[in-house]
C-alpha cells in the first residue's frame, strides 16, 4: 500500500477531518470523494490555499507555529499532519495540539535515519538531498529532522499512544525491508496516535 491508501484505511466514512499543513488539499479531496468526509485544511502558503479553493476544499490560512487555540478539544474525528511536523518551530507542542484537537491523529514524518540519508551524509559530508528531503539545506523548510526512534520516544515522553504505525520505502510504498528494520530502511513513517 502507499501512504494515501493507508490514510484512507485509517479514517471512517463521514468523519470530520482536519489536515494541518494541507498543501494543495489533494489528500482532503481524495478523502472527501472516497469517504464522504467533512474536510477542513489549514495552510500558510497562498498558492496552495488557492489550489484548495479551486478544488472546493475548505481551507483556513493560518500559521501552525502561532498556535491552534481556535480549535476546541476533540473537535475533529481525525487530525492529519503529513510531513509537516519537521518544519515547525516546536514539534512537541504541535504534537500535543494535534492529539488535543483530534480523537485520533495521523502523523507522517520523513525518517532522517533512512540508510540513503545516512550514506549520503557519510560519503558527501554534506546535508543529504533525497526523495523525502528534496531540497538543499539552505532552501529547505525542515528545521527539526528526526528518526523513527526519535519520534516514538517523543510520543512516549508526551504519553501519546501509538495505535498503529506503517513504514514506507523511498518510493512511498510499504516493503519488507522498511517494515523489518524501519529506522534504517524506511524513508517515511506514518503513525496513528491518540492521547
Describe each PLM feature range.
Residues 67-73:
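Short conserved loop adjoining the S-adenosyl-L-methionine
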Residues 21-23:
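Class I SAM-dependent methyltransferase "Motif I" SAM/SAH-binding loop
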Residues 80-89:
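A short SAM/SAH-binding and catalytic strip from SAM-dependent methyltransferases
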Residues 13, 74-75, 101:
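Alpha-helix C-terminal capping/helix-to-coil transition sites in glycosyltransferase folds
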Residues 26, 30-67:
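Class I SAM-dependent methyltransferase SAM/SAH-binding core
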Residues 92-97, 104-194:
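S-adenosyl-L-methionine-dependent methyltransferase catalytic module, highlighting the catalytic core
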Residues 1-14:
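Conserved alpha-helix/loop element of class I SAM-dependent methyltransferases that forms part
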Amino acid at each position: 500500500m502507499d501512504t494515501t491508501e493507508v490514510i484512507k484505511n485509517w479514517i471512517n466514512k463521514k468523519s470530520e477531518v482536519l489536515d494541518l499543513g494541507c498543501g494543495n488539499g489533494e489528500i482532503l479531496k481524495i478523502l472527501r470523494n472516497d469517504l464522504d468526509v467533512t474536510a477542513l485544511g489549514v495552510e500558510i502558503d497562498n498558492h496552495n490555499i488557492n489550489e484548495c479553493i479551486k478544488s472546493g476544499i475548505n481551507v483556513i490560512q493560518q500559521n501552525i507555529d502561532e498556535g491552534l487555540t481556535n480549535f476546541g478539544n476533540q473537535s475533529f474525528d481525525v487530525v492529519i499532519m503529513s510531513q509537516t511536523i519537521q518544519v515547525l518551530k516546536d514539534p512537541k507542542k504541535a504534537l500535543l495540539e494535534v492529539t488535543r484537537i483530534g480523537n485520533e491523529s495521523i502523523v507522517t514524518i520523513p525518517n532522517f535515519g533512512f540508510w540513503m540519508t545516512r550514506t549520503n551524509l557519510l560519503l558527501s559530508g554534506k546535508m543529504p538531498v533525497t526523495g523525502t528531503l528534496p531540497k538543499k539545506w539552505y532552501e529547505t523548510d525542515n528545521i527539526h529532522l528526526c528518526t523513527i526512534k526519535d519520534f516514538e520516544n517523543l510520543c512516549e515522553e508526551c504519553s501519546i499512544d501509538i495505535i498503529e504505525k506503517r513504514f514506507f520505502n523511498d518510493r512511498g510504498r510499504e516493503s519488507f525491508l522498511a517494515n523489518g528494520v524501519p529506522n534504517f530502511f524506511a524513508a517515511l513513517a506514518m503513525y496513528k496516535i491518540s492521547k
